[in-house]
Amino acid sequence: MLLIKRARIVEAASEKIPALRESIGKYKEKNHILVYCGATTVRDYGYQEGVPTSEEIRQIDAVTDLLGNQMGFRVAQFTSKEDALTRSKLIKSFDQGEMIQALIAIRCLDEGVNIPSIDKAFILASSTNPKEYIQRRGRVLRLYPGKNYAQIYDFITLPIPLDKVKGYATEDISGFKGLAKRELIRMMDFAKIAQNPYEIDTLIRDIKNAYDIEDEELERESEEEWDD
């Protein structure tokens, strides 16, 4: 069961790349874009600050190829490989928006990097830890001249597509509900402060119905996440 669950999650996560293509296309002429990659979080076993995993490297390279080569964005990677001077130059160029439209990064929102000019963020590195994703969100929402709001696309991972959930036995679905609940909690938290919560309300309702998740379950799960 654990192997199946892992395979489902990996497969679902890989679908974030085509979803990114669909979402980011309308910003082809815009600047100050961050694409935040990553397969692990600071709570994961084996996490080392400044040392990306092979999965993270594969994702950031895939995103770089998509945006830079296939879609024609002016991009740069922002990872632990760059020294402090290089990072400073990248941020300056990103702020100016002439040479770099988009930074494709690993972990920078978790490791103290401050780039307040970001006003469009595509977060592929989902976290179910509220303290972690609130910190990431807060870094994107930093004040900057001419920046009145930020647009955040937070990509969720569901182990089973909504249109296929009903084809699974109840006992199989129960093994996947934990992830679905944690993703729902993050979605609901984002919706609370969004200017367009109505765009996510329907999806939240559909996920609840498909996975048979009650509001009381989400409340308990949320309290447990904050207590960890």
Predicted regions: what they are:
Residues Q101-I106, D110-S127, E132-R139, Y149-F155:
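A short beta-strand element within the Helicase C-terminal
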Residues T40-V42, D83, L109-D110, S126-N129, ...:
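Conserved nucleotide-binding/hydrolysis micro-motifs of P-loop NTPases
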Residues S14-I17, A102, P130-I134, G146-Y149, ...:
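Amphipathic alpha-helical transducer elements in NTP-driven molecular machines
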Residues K164-D228:
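Long, largely alpha-helical accessory region at the distal end of helicase-like NTP-driven motors
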